Amino acid sequence: MEDTLGSEHSVCLSSWDWKNTAGAFELHSVSSPHSLSPTPSFESYSSSPCPAAAETPYSGGGLVGYGLVDFPPAYLPSPGQARLPKGTKVRMSAQRRRKASEREKLRMRTLADALHTLRNYLPPAYSQRGQPLTKIQTLKCTIKYISELTELLNSVKRA
């Protein structure tokens, strides 16, 4: 892989030392030329494809990076425990998805039947010529029709 990428990338790969770690992860310190600050610094921008190739090694004793072994065991997944990446949804089984789809179809069919019944009870003055009312129009016209019937009943009671 190093040979196909060219000499400029070989510096990056050699700083990782990915070929020489044949065994388990070992605790070792890695000198870091970068700041651990969340704000970007001027030095972090480089025209080089690899920051390690553009900068000189860090000789200060302040910031040191460590390998994977440094993390407490509570933060690492146990061997028998598989973790999904954050944001990944658990997939429903095909049977469960099919049942949910059938329930949703039945719910929509029941709603459509109820709206059709409401449309049949509305007088023709509320319907649009030749076109069935939409769901919202049906509900609004039904509310208006009920309020008109209520006013009519109240006026009869007063007389």
Curated annotation (Swiss-Prot):
It is found in: Nucleus. GO terms for cellular component: nucleus. Disulfide bonds: none annotated. Gene3D superfamilies: Helix-loop-helix DNA-binding domain. InterPro entries: bHLH_dom, HLH_DNA-bd_sf, Mesogenin/MesP. The keyword DNA-binding applies. The gene is MSGN1. GO terms for molecular function: DNA-binding transcription factor activity, RNA polymerase II-specific; protein dimerization activity; RNA polymerase II cis-regulatory region sequence-specific DNA binding. GO terms for biological process: cell differentiation; mesoderm formation; regulation of transcription by RNA polymerase II. Residues 79-101 are annotated as: Disordered. Residues 86-100 have a biased composition (Basic residues). It comes from Gallus gallus (Chicken). Residues 95-149 form the bHLH domain. This is Mesogenin-1. PANTHER family: IP14615P (PTHR20937), MESOGENIN-1 (PTHR20937:SF4). Pfam families: HLH (PF00010). SUPFAM superfamilies: HLH, helix-loop-helix DNA-binding domain. It comes from the Eukaryota.
